[in-house]
Amino acid sequence: MKQDNGTPPSPAIGATNSKPVPGKPATVVYACSGCSDAGELADRIARQLSRAGAARMSCLAGIGGRVKSLVATAEKAERILVIDGCPLNCARHTLRLAGFEHFDHLELHKIGIRKGSCPVTEERVSVGVEAAKAILMRVDEKSSIINRTSEIDCHAAVESIQTF
């Protein structure tokens, strides 16, 4: 889409140019991005996954607001990864209320992140990214058996990752 002056529009704030990893199904990632340290961690993990090309981050608020183009992004995704920072699971609830039932779910509290007591550090972001990748790999390895499960036990998927 071009602007009236003939130049392409600048990307939206927070937009990424990530592309699916070749040979892997397109994954869209949604983070709760809540106001706590755990929400900030979820957001930073999703952004890092998007920059690395492991998934494409999309707007969770747009799902909640039923913005047609953003809902269409979720509908077209071959898979969805939801990252929640705390046990309230706002991101999971938002997707379910919008009619999405099948997605992978990383709950940061299950890997030792405690809302209000885990300041955002690069180490914690890296642990979260590895946990997300472990979940995505686990689903890839078992996709013919489990055929896209609704939820994965993220604690089991990251047994080898040290928690905080």
Role assignments for model-derived ranges:
Residues 1-59, 69, 74-79, 89-164:
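Iron-sulfur (Fe-S) cluster-binding modules
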Residues 60-63, 83-85:
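Short His-Asn-centered micro-motif
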Residues 66:
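S-adenosyl-L-methionine/SAH cofactor-binding core of RNA-modifying enzymes
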